[in-house]
């Protein structure tokens, strides 16, 4: 039993290593090179606080009565452009990312499920995770999509995560024999029966 556990852990570590290597190879060419370059400045742990600051700054802007309507509009346009550029960098960072450890996955999940992060941003991040996992299969991102599907209150985010999970599952035929894959597939089948109104 101890030996089987050791072998399982070694295989898991090898999988993580291979995910990083394959993503590094892809990031040396084509569009992934650009995505990695544009997203490399993003710290995953700072994504949620930074997105929340944008919301706070927007609220404060409209509460600032010292500014004229025109000044507020100009400041709002600048803030929106800054916010869009930041979202684009997050997307690039997520798509070109390698293996995420448990802490990073928890931070990403918390960000996507946060009520202070708008639905469109959460959907964008789910799409980025989907593209990353569909390009280089990563069991951690695969299960993260499933967790987001299960836990999201926002139906749009929930459906995006489910579709992402299904897309990734069709791209990872070699993992169909993986015990985790089978258990997730069985659980998802049950969940879809309960959430048939979403489909």
Label the model's feature ranges.
Residues 9-16, 32-37, 123-129, 159-170, ...:
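Alpha-helical solenoid repeat scaffolds
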Residues 1-69, 81-85:
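Extended, helix-rich scaffolding/adaptor regions
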Residues 21, 28, 132, 191-195:
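Short secondary-structure junctions and interdomain/linker hinges
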Residues 46-152, 158, 164, 168-177:
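Alpha-helical solenoid scaffolds in large eukaryotic transport, assembly, and signaling factors
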Residues 178-199:
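Long alpha-helical HEAT/HEAT-like repeat alpha-solenoid scaffolds in very large eukaryotic proteins
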Residues 9, 16, 144-151, 184:
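The canonical alpha-helical register within tetratricopeptide repeats
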């Amino acid at each position: 039993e101890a030996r089987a556990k050791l072998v399982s852990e070694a295989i898991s570590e090898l999988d993580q290593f291979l995910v990083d290597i394959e993503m590094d190879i892809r990031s040396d060419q084509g569009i992934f090179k650009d995505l990695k370059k544009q997203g490399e400045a993003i710290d995953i742990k700072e994504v949620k606080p930074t997105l929340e600051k944008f919301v706070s700054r927007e609220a404060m802007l409209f509460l600032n009565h010292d500014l004229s309507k025109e000044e507020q509009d100009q400041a709002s346009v600048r803030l929106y452009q800054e916010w869009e550029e930041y979202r684009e960098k997050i997307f690039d960072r997520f798509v070109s990312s390698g293996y995420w450890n448990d802490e990073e996955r928890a931070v990403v999940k918390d960000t996507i499920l946060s009520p202070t992060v708008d639905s469109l941003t959460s959907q964008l991040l789910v799409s980025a995770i989907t593209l990353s996992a569909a390009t280089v299969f990563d069991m951690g991102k695969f299960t993260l999509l499933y967790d987001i599907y299960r836990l999201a209150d926002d139906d749009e985010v929930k459906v995006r995560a489910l579709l992402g999970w299904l897309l990734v599952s069709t791209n990872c035929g070699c993992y169909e024999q993986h015990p985790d894959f089978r258990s997730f597939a069985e659980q998802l089948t049950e969940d879809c029966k309960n959430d048939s109104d979403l489909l």
